[in-house]
UniProtKB/Swiss-Prot annotation:
Residues 21-44 form a propeptide. This is U3-lycotoxin-Ls1n. Keywords: Disulfide bond, Knottin, Secreted, Signal, Toxin. It comes from Lycosa singoriensis (Wolf spider). It is found in: Secreted. Disulfide bonds join 48-63, 55-72, 62-87, 74-85. The lineage of its organism: Eukaryota, Metazoa, Ecdysozoa, Arthropoda, Chelicerata.
Length: 115
């Protein structure tokens, strides 16, 4: 019986040690991947077109707002023949961002009350 107990403790110890090493390896890989994604995002962010600026040269270059990417909207100004394109945020996305911000504030208040 002592042998079975000793063998069980040894098995549990080895299992926990091996799983801890595997988790460390995964954490390191995740950190490296996250850093590379952040670097790529920073590099990409330098090339984006700000809101209300001309995006006719590249219609997919609009910057991101807090939650959503702006959309290149083209129109013909009154009395003009030239098409004008600017990066704009659609109204429904603007309202969704505003609602998400209010929900975040409300969640903070609830945490403050009950946390």
């Amino acid at each position: 019986m002592k042998f079975v107990l000793l063998f069980g403790v040894l098995l549990v110890t080895l299992f926990s040690y091996s799983s801890a090493e595997m988790l460390d390896d995964f954490d390191q890989a995740d950190e490296d991947e996250l850093l590379s994604l952040i670097e790529k995002e920073e590099a990409r962010a330098k090339e984006c077109t700000p809101r209300f600026y001309d995006c006719s040269h590249d219609r997919h270059s609009c910057c991101r707002s807090e939650l959503f990417k702006d959309v290149c909207t083209c129109f013909y100004p009154e009395g003009g023949d030239n098409e004008v394109c600017t990066c704009q945020q659609p109204k429904h996305l603007k309202y969704m961002e505003k609602a998400a911000g209010e929900a975040k504030k409300f969640g903070g208040k609830i945490k403050k009350w009950f946390g």
